[in-house]
Amino acid sequence: MNIICGYNVNIDSVYRISGVEISELLKNCERTEILEKIEKPPGKILSESDFVAGLAYCMKNGCGAEWLVLERAVFEFLKNRYFEKSLVRMGGNAGIMANALSQLGVSRVIPNVAVPSKIQLSLFSGRSIYFPGLTAERKGNSEAESGKMDSKEMDSKEIDSKENMYAVSSSQEPIHFVFDFSKGDTFSLYGTQIIIPRENRFIATCDNLNLRLYVNPAFEKYALEQACEIDGALISGFHLLLENYHDGSSYKTILENTLYQLKSWKTKNDKLRIHLELGHFASKNIANSVFLEFGAISYSIGMNEDELATLRHFHGVPGEEILLMEAEAVGNAVYRLASRYKLKKIVIHTREFVLTVFKPNLELNSKLVSELNSEPTSKLNSKPAPEGSADLRVLEELGDFESSSLQKIAGGKLESLRFGVSCAGAYAASGRLEGRKFVEEEALKLQESTIGKKQLNLFLKAFNGQALGQGAYAFNGEYILCMLPTLLS
């Protein structure tokens, strides 16, 4: 299996910040300025006070956010203060997904790497990663052509040669400073004691190339030439785009070029499955455009509760309920998005649970679900449900054959979610993914989210669902909803 991963690959500098530390940072900033910026968040970082205000805002509200650092002086401040004492790891959805896939057995993974520096390349897995223009350049043998990257090949001399090839300097490296904070920690906001209501993170992003969705020319050439051999494409990084750039260009041109690129791949390979992963958008206009334009050509879309709430004008469910991770609100919102915009699959991943809505792949089963929802009310003993309501049909209303068939589909999806949850839990707990056996063993050490289990019961009631294994499923229209609690350490 060959998988393309685009577009954002970067370096994450992860630091857990305490209430004491944010209190000290606040003391060094002007009170009125910080309070004004907390009241009206600027959404970007042009000064140290912008950074402190953004961090304090997220810690105060227990929310997550990602703001772009647009001044070099702030980048130097963050790097000098936090980089050496932080956990340095692979960042960017494309980079993280590339490593995960390679470690789980995908034969070839092709990431788009904007800045192939020594540090950046060292963060990739030593398994099955193929760098167009670099891997084949380094070795002329069949091993290089196969794209299988063994960790022993990645010595410093070879990495240095790749670095020189792209004239990369460490000052250009895309670094995302990730500040994790803990629920229940406290800090002083100029005399007001704040208790952090929820664990989350604030990200200060220093990334000039990825914020333009830069595509490495070698990656672009390879993807187009080998499109027929590619099984899937995971695309992300759109949340880093700006509405306008200093050179007068805008995000619209970037989206047009990217959409053209993806359509070119699909033209060469109509079986290519594209997964679109959203992110924390600073601009609602960009979020809207990405959802509408790229959702239409994607096989599946992934997002968290914050991103789902951002799209509330498309689904009409109050954002407050979604942000509280209420399963009924999340389920209604995701169903409305899928049904209104004719999407095949959406996956919502929160800290406490994952929830997906999808159309069954088999035409037979799609018809069965449609017929079930169109049955006369006398037969189903229920009134027709308006769009988005919780009046869903359960398997018990079906005949034995149909029930068994659809239950297998729901069960298969829940098993996929279970493995995904296990991977996420194992990675969060250990920082590693070393194959399926490792994932399953690590998952046994984790506990199901208590909040997730509570929301699962509410899901069953709200959607008239059916429990299956550790999860549950329900029907609405042509769609099946599945939900599963996450695993936490």
Listing of model-derived features with the role each one plays in the protein:
Residues 1-488:
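Ribokinase/PfkB-type carbohydrate-kinase core domain
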